[in-house]
């Protein structure tokens, strides 16, 4: 498993935001990908990404730890936006 890989967990797409440095751990930190429509977008905190031909927002404020075995197979990878996603984690945890 690697940072920015996408999985489907219980019908929800999630992106792995955990550094690969901790790849041997039994858990991974993930954030859900949501359609912008029903979810509020906060500047800096909910970066937009393209995946599977659609535009999503990464809901960093919904971070969760998931057992790696519960993630299942990778269904893809987010190719851009890494810096924006990690900056959003900083905003959530440090306030800037």
List each language-model region with its residue ranges.
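C-terminal terminal-subdomain/extension
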Residues: 51-96
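Domain-scale selection of a single, long terminal region
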Residues: 1-6, 55-59
């Amino acid at each position: 498993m690697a940072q920015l890989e996408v999985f489907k967990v219980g019908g929800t797409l999630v992106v792995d935001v955990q550094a690969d440095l901790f790849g041997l751990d039994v858990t991974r930190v993930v954030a859900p990908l949501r359609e912008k429509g029903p979810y509020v977008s906060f500047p800096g905190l909910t970066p937009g990404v393209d995946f599977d031909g659609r535009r999503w927002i990464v809901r960093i404020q919904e971070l969760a730890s998931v057992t790696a075995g519960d993630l299942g197979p990778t269904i893809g990878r987010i190719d851009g936006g890494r810096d924006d996603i990690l900056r959003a984690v900083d905003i959530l945890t440090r306030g800037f």
